[in-house]
């Protein structure tokens, strides 16, 4: 979507930008593809906070997205491009030949009226879903399955994609490069969708004021250096005191910069050919 700017009529409006929603063709969601979405305030069943800086936000309904794309040999028509408040990407409403409706992530260039397919014999064109082993090298893909039949898990945010680099000698795995720079092997029978996720301009939005972040369910991110010493390792001292430790610390007293957090014994590590950039 294109970016629109606002006149500086107030301090909050100054430097604010937003979407013009020019690519959105339908403003009301498909009722049969909606689900209830309850807010937890980032608290678990015991009432304890499990994630910081989450809470509040506008009420939303969840759009049920088809991440698996297993309805083979049925051509679907893109009925509309819709806004989804639950993600950065837009979504596309599909209507299959037999009347079944579903939502998919809207890739770049997909328009209302386009025909899309899924399955091993589908054409290599934007919006079609195929097994990775059937997609040629160099193709940009998104909504990538880590395990066959589990549904897409990688490259789902606005503007993201991965690229197919090749296959292993046995043909069991396909080598892809993710947007992070990581190169990894994925089973050739796992599915992915052709193209890159649309709405790449999302990263250019200037939210402008704190209230817009609160509407999105984000609460203030307080610096540890302005807390009391019993609340954070950086807290206390007179004025703008230094950290007081050999390296910056998390609120729980662990090193927060540069420490690797991935489990060394994680089974999927063997599928990573090269780590992320700078790692």
UniProtKB/Swiss-Prot annotation:
Gene3D superfamilies tied to this protein: 2.30.30.30, Nucleic acid-binding proteins (2.40.50.140), Ribosomal protein L2, domain 3 (4.10.950.10)
GO cellular component terms listed in the entry, alphabetical order: large ribosomal subunit
Span list, region Disordered: 211-279
Keywords, comma-separated and alphabetical: Ribonucleoprotein, Ribosomal protein, RNA-binding, rRNA-binding
GO annotation (BP), single: cytoplasmic translation
InterPro entries documented for this protein: NA-bd_OB-fold, Rib_uL2_dom2, Ribosomal_uL2, Ribosomal_uL2_bac/org-type, Ribosomal_uL2_C, Ribosomal_uL2_CS, Ribosomal_uL2_dom3, Ribosomal_uL2_RNA-bd_dom
Pfam family, one: Ribosomal_L2_C
PROSITE patterns assigned to the protein according to its UniProt record, in alphabetical order: RIBOSOMAL_L2
Feature: compositional bias, Basic residues: 211-221, 256-279
A single MF term (Gene Ontology): rRNA binding
SUPFAM superfamilies the UniProt entry points to: Nucleic acid-binding proteins (SSF50249), Translation proteins SH3-like domain (SSF50104)
HAMAP family: Ribosomal_uL2_B
The protein's role, per its UniProt record: One of the primary rRNA binding proteins. Required for association of the 30S and 50S subunits to form the 70S ribosome, for tRNA binding and peptide bond formation. It has been suggested to have peptidyltransferase activity; this is somewhat controversial. Makes several contacts with the 16S rRNA in the 70S ribosome.
Subunit note: Part of the 50S ribosomal subunit. Forms a bridge to the 30S subunit in the 70S ribosome.
Similarity remark: Belongs to the universal ribosomal protein uL2 family.
Protein name: Large ribosomal subunit protein uL2
Species name: Oenococcus oeni (strain ATCC BAA-331 / PSU-1)
Gene: rplB
